[in-house]
Design a protein with these regions (language model features):
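Amphipathic coiled-coil/heptad-repeat helices and related helical stalk/stem segments
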Residues: 120-121, 201
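A generic structural motif
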Residues: 132-133, 213
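Asp-based, Mg2+/Mn2+-dependent phosphohydrolase catalytic module
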Residues: 8-28, 126, 142-143, 148-223
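N-terminal helical cap/lid subdomain that shapes the substrate entry/recognition surface
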Residues: 10-21, 25-119, 127, 131
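Active-site-adjacent beta-strand anchor residues
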Residues: 41, 118, 136-140, 174, ...
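Short active-site oxyanion
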Residues: 133-136, 193-194
Length: 223
């Protein structure tokens, strides 16, 4: 298996395991930046179920099927996704409160269940640590989500593995804007050409590419 580098075209053929041979190609970089939670763990279906549970408790008759949620994932931002969906349904709701409820269900699930890292992720992290390559996590999700992810991964991956971890409080604009990547570059004290980003969606890849960072596509099951 090899890394497949892309420009603005997101190819589903890029979902390959990162083996040792692939990791050795990282040696020329000063940093590797994981861009989203989905590049480390597969959570899309858990999040979909958490949304549906929140809808039910909120008194909404909404239900996101796997195929519908897959289409919704083409755009970043949970609250933004909810706002557009509510407008489509011509319903006024408190999207922040609804998203917070979904986040609670999502985090509750992660605290009670263990999730393994995606195939190859541990190889990358261990290789980078062994070769003094910095690790960044350019996520713009909530701190609660980040904490829950690392809680469920505590026996395999932890926060200390990363030199910098982003969150939604650090940026005003979500992906595909490059803001979170610009902050990550600054915190890691590196230039765009000195690092490689890994993203799981086309929308998120645009964020890295706009920051002039080379990016590899690593799509999840619903992307």
């Amino acid at each position: 298996c090899t890394f497949i580098f892309v420009s603005y075209v997101f190819s589903k053929t890029n979902n390959k395991w990162f083996d040792r041979w692939s990791c050795e190609r990282l040696i020329k970089y000063k940093a590797v930046i994981f861009g989203s939670i989905g590049t480390i763990v597969e959570t899309s279906n858990i999040q979909r179920k958490s949304f549906n549970k929140a809808f039910k408790e909120f008194g909404l008759d909404w239900y996101w099927s796997t195929s519908e949620y897959k289409k919704l994932l083409e755009k970043s931002g949970g609250e933004n996704r909810l706002s557009k969906y509510a407008n489509k349904k011509n319903i006024k709701i408190n999207t922040k409160k609804l998203r917070d409820l979904k986040t609670k269900f999502f985090n509750d699930y992660l605290k009670k269940n263990k999730i393994k890292p995606r195939a190859g992720v541990l190889n990358i992290i261990n290789f980078c640590k062994k070769n003094n390559i910095k690790l960044g996590f350019a996520t713009s999700t909530t701190v609660n989500n980040i904490n829950s992810i690392f809680f469920t991964l505590k026996n395999t991956i932890n926060k200390k593995d990363f030199n910098f971890i982003g969150n939604n409080k650090l940026v005003l604009r979500e992906k595909p804007y490059p803001d979170i990547y610009m902050i990550t570059l600054k915190k890691l004290k590196i230039r765009p050409k000195e690092c490689l980003a890994i993203e799981d969606t086309e929308e998120s890849m645009k964020s890295a590419l706009k920051a002039k960072i080379r990016c590899v596509a690593f799509p999840g099951k619903l992307h």
